[in-house]
């Protein structure tokens, strides 16, 4: 066990052994992300361990690659009793005539989650394989189509269509099948998360939004991802299967980024709103999650509101209550 793992687990005996073997400044040894043992102790709420490290020369002001001192690390201690979650992904297109009912169902799921304070997070990925001819989806992205194909390859053999709803990377159904959707969500909400995730907006300047997402745990074949989403979009469609209709859309993914995990990680994701599609860029949010890359199963998720309008300030604490 490394000194960082021991600090996160509160194992003072193991930490003491490391310090005896490596006298001097080993108490401040760093990971590739520049986390010290004290960062891990703070992130897990290990007060006794934190005091022990400080008594043995830990640097209280040591900064990781995000510029965070140990006291700046969000609490990443996982409360298994309250960590159940469901990440609902909808694969959709403005050019798909079967998709509007699925869009409405996903919006209903989000409203229910907010009203009941459930850890249900919704993201709608617009695929690009409907584009062409008389209409191209303004939110489509080839990367989103590739993500759906990854599910087909790694999890759901032969299952590749719109509207497709995928819950926690484990269950899939037609996106407008209400009973199937809620069955998958209820199954997911019976199982605790296995990692803690924190996400918050950290700055905003000149068309860019920065989101700090952190997670902690032992990872293999996993990635930390953040989706920038917008709610309350209305679009008049003038071509394709939905020609003549005005579509109302929530949870629309404007931009999506991932980093592979090799241990506890804090990462800053920057989104340039000048370069992403969008409506009025109001009602923005960020959904962060940790997902296995081998079988696509979700390990944990969280969300926060994104402030973009002039005069708005970032939330001090993460919140899933954005509209």
Which residues does each predicted region cover?
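Short, conserved sequence motifs used for protein processing/export or organelle targeting and
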Residues: 136-164, 168-323
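Ankyrin repeat A-helix N-terminal signature
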Residues: 5-11, 40-46, 73-76
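Typically the conserved alpha-helix immediately C-terminal to a functionally engaged Cys/Sec
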Residues: 100-114
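Ankyrin repeat structural motif
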Residues: 11-20, 46-54
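Thiol-based oxidoreductase modules, predominantly thioredoxin-like and allied folds used
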Residues: 117-145
């Amino acid at each position: 066990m490394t000194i960082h793992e021991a600090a996160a687990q509160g194992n003072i005996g193991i930490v003491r052994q490391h310090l005896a073997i490596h006298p001097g400044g080993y108490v401040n040894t760093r990971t590739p992300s520049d986390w010290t043992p004290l960062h891990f102790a703070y992130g897990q709420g290990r007060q006794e361990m934190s005091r022990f490290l400080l008594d043995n020369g830990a640097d209280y002001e040591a900064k990781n690659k995000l510029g965070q001192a140990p006291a700046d690390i969000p609490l990443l201690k996982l409360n298994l009793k309250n960590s159940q979650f469901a990440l609902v992904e909808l694969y959709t297109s403005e050019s798909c005539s079967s998709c509007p009912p699925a869009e409405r169902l996903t919006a209903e799921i989000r409203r229910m989650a907010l009203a009941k304070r459930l850890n249900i997070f919704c993201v709608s990925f617009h695929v690009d394989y409907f584009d062409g001819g008389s209409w191209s989806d303004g939110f489509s992205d080839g990367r989103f189509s590739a993500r759906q194909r990854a599910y087909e390859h790694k999890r759901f053999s032969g299952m590749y269509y719109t509207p497709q709803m995928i819950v926690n990377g484990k269950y899939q159904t037609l996106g407008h099948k209400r009973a199937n959707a809620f069955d998958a969500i209820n199954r997911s909400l019976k199982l605790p998360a296995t990692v803690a995730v924190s996400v918050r907006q950290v700055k905003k300047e000149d068309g860019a939004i920065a989101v700090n997402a952190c997670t902690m745990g032992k990872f293999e074949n996993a990635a930390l991802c953040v989706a920038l989403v917008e709610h309350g979009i209305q679009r008049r469609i003038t071509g394709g299967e939905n020609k003549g209709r005005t579509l109302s859309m929530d949870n629309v993914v404007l931009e999506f980024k991932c980093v592979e995990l090799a241990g506890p990680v804090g990462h800053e994701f920057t989104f340039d709103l000048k370069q992403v599609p969008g409506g009025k860029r109001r009602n923005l949010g960020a959904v962060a999650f940790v997902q296995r890359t081998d079988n696509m199963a979700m390990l944990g998720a969280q969300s926060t509101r994104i402030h973009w309008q002039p005069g708005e300030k970032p939330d001090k604490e993460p919140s899933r209550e954005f509209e």
